[in-house]
Swiss-Prot record:
CDD domains: YqgF (cd16964). GO terms for biological process: rRNA 5'-end processing. Could be a nuclease involved in processing of the 5'-end of pre-16S rRNA. This is Putative pre-16S rRNA nuclease. InterPro entries: RNaseH-like_sf, YqgF, YqgF/RNaseH-like_dom, YqgF/RNaseH-like_dom_sf. Belongs to the YqgF nuclease family.
Amino acid sequence: MPEETLLAFDFGEKKIGIAIGNTLTRQARPLEIIFSETRAARFGRIGQLLQEWQPQRAVVGLPLTLDGQEQPASARARRFANQLHGHFGLAVELVDERSSSMEAQQLLGTHADDDAVAAAVILQRYLDTLSQP
């Protein structure tokens, strides 16, 4: 697989956690949290990040129930992924995000804003699947 830069998104209606990583190092790290309720502001900032980091692909967390079923938030995440693809022409992968926020809180050791760390957990899961046969 050629080297790719990836941005990951932990989508929420009021804030979006963002992480960055690449397929060469197979490491993900938190980047930032977008705090905005307006679609225009969210996509404006996302456009700036895409310009700055030039990712080849995006990874969006797909919220599922504990037994792996879709829920109302799943449709919102899918819509966001479709908008990323439509607005920016970016290839988008959906990744099961079950327990990513809980894992992020454990990593942080606090209940602080964990959205960017949750995005890094989601991206790391995706990167880890790339190394599996």
